[in-house]
Design a protein with these regions (language model features):
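Cell-envelope and extracellular/periplasmic
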Residues: 1-302
Length: 302
C-alpha cells in the first residue's frame, strides 16, 4: 500500500529504505528499461514503465524483482504478471499434467489456462506494450511463482502441493518450449517464524523443488526463496490481513528483491547488493510519451 504505517511512502520517503525508488525531487523513480504488464487486467495498450505506481495504488513483489533484473540485463526487460487472489494451485491453477479431479467443473484449471493465455496475448502484442520494440525479438527468460494460501485449507491439496508444483514448472516450460527455463518459487511466509503447521507444510513443498537432493532434475534451474524472514507484524503494517502479508510494502519489496537475486543466479550472474543499486544507462532514457487519451485509458486498466 502507498498509505499508512508500513506503506511505501513511509518506508521509502520517510525512513529512507530502498532509496532507488525515490528521485532527488522526492518523486517515484521510473525505470524505462523495465516494462510491466498485468496480463489479466491490462488491455492491448502500452505497458507501464516500472515504478511504485505501475500497479495502481498497491505494489507486489514485481517492483523489487524488476529493479534487480533491470540492473542485471543490458536488454529491455518485460515483466508479465498474471495474478488472481484466493486461488489454489491444486484446483484453480491445476496444471495439465496433474489431470482433472472434476472434468465437469468449469473452474478447475481455469486460472492455469487464463495465465497461459494472458502471457501469450501479451507477447503477441509486445510491439504495442514495449515502446521501441520494432521486431527486436524476445526470450522467455524465466518464471516466478508466489502463492500458497488457498491450498492450505484442503488436506488433499496440501498433500499434493509438491507434485502439482513440479507439474506446473514442467508444463509452463513445455507451453513456451523452454525445457530449462529458470524458475524461482517464493514460499508462503504468513506469520514468519510463528507460522501455523498447515502453512509450514506448504512451505516445505515449495522449498523441496529448489532442493537439488530432492529434485536433482532441477539442479541449477529451479530455486526456492524462504520468505518467512520478510514477515512484518500488524503493528508495523497498514492492515491486519495476514493473507496479504498485512499489506506491508517492505515485505513485498524484500520478497521481490530476493526472488530477483535468485533469478539472476540461475541466469549465471550475480545481483548488485541491495544497498548499492546500479541502474543501466537504458533506465535513465526518457520513455515514449503517451497521449492524454492513452494515459486515461491506461489508468482505467489498472
Amino acid at each position: 500500500d502507498l498509505l499508512g504505517n508500513g506503506d511505501l511512502e513511509a518506508i521509502a520517503k520517510r525512513e529512507g529504505k530502498f532509496p532507488w525508488l525515490v528521485d532527488a525531487a522526492g518523486e517515484w523513480t521510473v525505470r524505462n528499461d523495465v516494462y510491466f504488464q498485468e496480463a489479466r487486467v491490462a488491455e492491448n495498450g502500452k505497458g507501464s514503465p516500472l515504478s511504485a505506481t505501475s500497479n495502481g495504488k498497491s505494489i507486489g513483489p514485481e517492483l523489487g524483482f524488476g529493479h534487480v533484473l533491470g540492473n542485471f540485463h543490458d536488454e529491455q526487460v518485460l515483466l508479465i504478471k498474471t495474478a488472481m487472489g484466493n486461488r489454489a494451485l491444486g484446483f484453480d491453477f491445476r496444471p495439465p499434467s496433474s489431470g482433472r479431479t472434476d472434468p465437469d467443473n468449469k473452474f478447475e484449471a481455469l486460472e492455469y489456462k487464463l495465465m497461459i493465455d494472458g502471457v501469450r496475448k501479451t507477447l503477441a502484442n509486445i510491439d504495442k506494450i514495449v515502446p521501441g520494440y520494432n521486431g527486436a525479438g524476445y526470450d522467455v527468460a524465466g518464471f516466478v511463482w508466489f502463492q500458497g494460501h488457498k491450498d492450505s485449507f484442503s488436506e488433499d491439496l496440501i498433500q499434493g502441493y509438491e507434485k502439482n508444483l513440479v507439474n506446473l514448472i514442467n508444463d509452463v516450460r513445455k507451453e513456451f518450449e523452454v525445457p530449462q527455463m529458470p524458475c524461482v518459487v517464493a514460499t508462503v511466509g504468513f506469520g514468519g517464524n510463528n507460522m501455523s503447521e498447515k502453512f509450514v507444510r506448504i512451505l516445505d513443498a515449495q522449498m523441496a523443488v529448489g532442493n537439488a537432493v530432492k529434485h536433482p532434475e532441477y539442479a541449477g534451474t529451479v530455486a526456492s526463496v524462504d520468505t518467512r524472514k520478510f514477515w512484518r507484524e500488524v503493528d508495523q503494517s497498514p492492515r491486519n490481513q495476514d493473507y496479504h502479508y498485512n499489506r506491508n510494502a517492505e515485505t513485498y519489496m524484500l520478497i521481490g528483491d530476493a526472488m530477483g537475486r535468485s533469478m539472476v543466479e540461475l541466469l549465471g550472474g550475480k545481483a548488485d547488493p541491495l544497498s548499492v543499486p546500479v541502474m543501466s544507462a537504458r533506465a535513465t532514457k526518457q520513455p515514449v510519451e503517451n497521449s492524454e487519451d492513452e494515459k486515461i485509458a491506461q489508468q482505467k486498466s489498472l
